[in-house]
Amino acid sequence: MAGIDLNADLGEGFGVWRLGDDDAMLGIVSSANVACGFHAGDPAGLLRVCRSAAERGVRVGAQVSYRDLAGFGRRFIDVAADELLADVVYQIGALQAIAHAAGSSVCYVKPHGALYNTIVTHPAQAAAVAEAVRLVDPGLPVLGMAGSVFFDEAARRGLRVVAEAFADRAYRPDGRLVSRREPGAVLADPAAIAERVLAMVETGAVTAVDGTRLALSVESVCVHGDSPGAVQIATAVRDRLRAAGVEIRAFC
């Protein structure tokens, strides 16, 4: 069976405050979505994560977001397109320098949180993010949701789009993620999540919260590093995929 990428959000601590177990997750995933300082992450912590990723052969991606430290990037911001474009260029550039100093490089871009969800349907912001990536490096793939306006804008600019699925998030019937504010939005049982991911990879489909079967394009699977039991969930997913003969490998 073909391989699949496993990605996780890392580098999201700040100062003395730590979120998740970055070191443990880097021993499991093939790609690390590293924060760029706008929703989380400080320079020393980001350098540490990039160094560890380089040592383990884990690919580094720039996890760009709204300028929202207090809200962890999970709040929609009605920012002008030109300002958002500049913010994304800045974030990619900052992480490129840190990754280079760590002996690695940024090989893809993934929007974070509210920005990720917004550009599924918001044409102006989707275009701004896609254009920012193109301006920095048109060879950088973008990781996101298949069928999104963001993917349309990225493809229009010649960017490679990489579709991802979420291991531990519930899906709505329209294919979008259930809001974290709603009960059952974040899944927690490692064994059940692992079986769900294997089914996604093997069948190209997932069951929404109302029982609807949704077609799902999957090149990468996100296992959130900040979820309760994240390491156990990621380990279960990796082990189940490997047991089924699915190779864990990066897409870039």
UniProtKB/Swiss-Prot annotation:
Family matches, as InterPro entries: Glyco_hydro/deAcase_b/a-brl, LamB/YcsF/PxpA-like
Record's catalysed reaction(s): 5-oxo-L-proline + ATP + 2 H2O = L-glutamate + ADP + phosphate + H(+)
PANTHER family in the cross-refs: 5-OXOPROLINASE SUBUNIT A (PTHR30292:SF0), UNCHARACTERIZED PROTEIN YBGL-RELATED (PTHR30292)
Subunit structure: Forms a complex composed of PxpA, PxpB and PxpC.
Family according to the record: Belongs to the LamB/PxpA family.
Function: Catalyzes the cleavage of 5-oxoproline to form L-glutamate coupled to the hydrolysis of ATP to ADP and inorganic phosphate.
The protein's name: 5-oxoprolinase subunit A
Species of origin: Mycobacterium avium (strain 104)
Upper classification of the organism: Bacteria, Bacillati, Actinomycetota, Actinomycetes, Mycobacteriales
